[in-house]
């Protein structure tokens, strides 16, 4: 504890936000309130130990400038630099004497360790770290490749935490990503406003994969996302039931109808085939690139580009027209082969995002290999494979009926915006 305590104890006087457990200076307040949560702050005065943050200000600034990927997204980095580093860091109060609950300061038991010092140090102490002995787990897992944390606690993770590590002589995490919120309009979720919806309630009404899809797809990289029942249902019907669900259902149904459920060989080449194959097999590299930069929503868009291209391929090749002429049956077989192979690739790509849906698709088309590596090759599906029954992946929702049902159950107006909370208390 003393290793990081650069300045001896003194008297702290400033503004304290109890919900955020944060101290603020007069100039940092916004309209006299906490700049993070907007709640009232109270004047605090007590004896405390201080961490001389300014000693490391230039070092941290140099690190951020030489490691542009350290704080992401870029807008968050600018916020930390312009709002905290450039104005000059204040000494950080790292102990409290106004209460007794918490971890006592070892060399001065009358002081309790400030909660954020305790919380942040857990990243390494949980791995067995001590200044005297690092430990096997610490050497294996630290530094972390990425901290993914809420944007409201970015200051603690990109200023306090790096400086703590610098003071200890330990490496910094390679990247800190401040993820956005799922908002109610332009505000955070609030129980007092009655606008909270729990993830398990969404799952009960829409299924877990639909919730996964919405949460991952509707959360932009750098901006807050929003959710309403209306938009959720619209996405469910358009993206899942129609775009994806109809593609799988139509393809399996046509194979059952025209070839008694048996996948034909794909050796009668025609127009549009090459473009479909290129889009399907090229998706994985684009997805990996997006995921490596934490653009999760954009990575899902790459999957839906394959889905959209497959639906367009159906319109271009008109298999129902080919089925009318016996001479066109070989070409029809190839068209359906190309579709089912594209669907196999889609199922593989979805396996990390929507695992239940991926499994259902694989069962319907008789696919075994859903590895990411297999998506780079077009032609893994074996001719002669039997498809299953064409069962809808997602049943369309009657929006008016479902909204009324939700209003009755949760007592919320149909047009009220809501947020996802992970678990009930």
PLM regions with names:
Residues 241, 245, 277, 281, ...:
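Generic structural concept
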Residues 220-223, 227-231, 236, 251-273, ...:
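Long, amphipathic alpha-helical stalk/connector segments used for oligomerization, subunit docking
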Residues 13-20, 180-182, 231-232, 264-271, ...:
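A glycine-rich phosphate-binding loop feature that marks nucleotide/adenosyl-phosphate handling sites
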Residues 19, 36-37, 43-257, 299-303:
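Structured secondary-structure scaffolds
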Residues 7, 24, 41:
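Cys/His-rich microdomains that often coordinate metals
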Residues 2-6:
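Short, small-residue-biased leader/transition segments that mark boundaries at the very start
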Residues 31, 66-68, 108, 131-141, ...:
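Short, glycine- and charge-enriched coil/turn segments that flank and shape catalytic ligand pockets
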Residues 11-15, 25-37, 289, 293-294, ...:
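Basic, alpha-helical terminal appendages of large translation-related enzymes
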